[in-house]
């Protein structure tokens, strides 16, 4: 199973000491729900807010820091994507990323938050996200 990751620096929030990270995975010929990967983690800290454009959920995952996936997530940095960049992936064909494969990760000294973003159509139905750029991970310790 081939995996490509999008990563660019996203910036930091000095007022709250949070370092926002955003990560997206593309699984060739496969689909995966990141939420299901973390189903065993305590999700009591979920809270949700809706905007005109997206539905956003936060989950505090203190145990992810010690996991292999957590180490992989922490090794990736990337910047925000504008609406104009949510287009066709540059892979020679159109590659659509499911909503739950697009994550925003906000990390502080004591907590790690995963932000799952789902874009909504004008009728309120969710639709897949499209990512326009794929970049090589600078130092990927998991060559799969």
Swiss-Prot record:
It comes from the Eukaryota. Disruption phenotype: Deletion leads to overproduction and excretion of inositol into the growth medium. Partially overlaps VID21. Disruption phenotypes caused by deletion of this gene may also be a result of a defect in its overlapping gene. This is Putative uncharacterized protein OPI7. It comes from Saccharomyces cerevisiae (strain ATCC 204508 / S288c). The gene is OPI7.
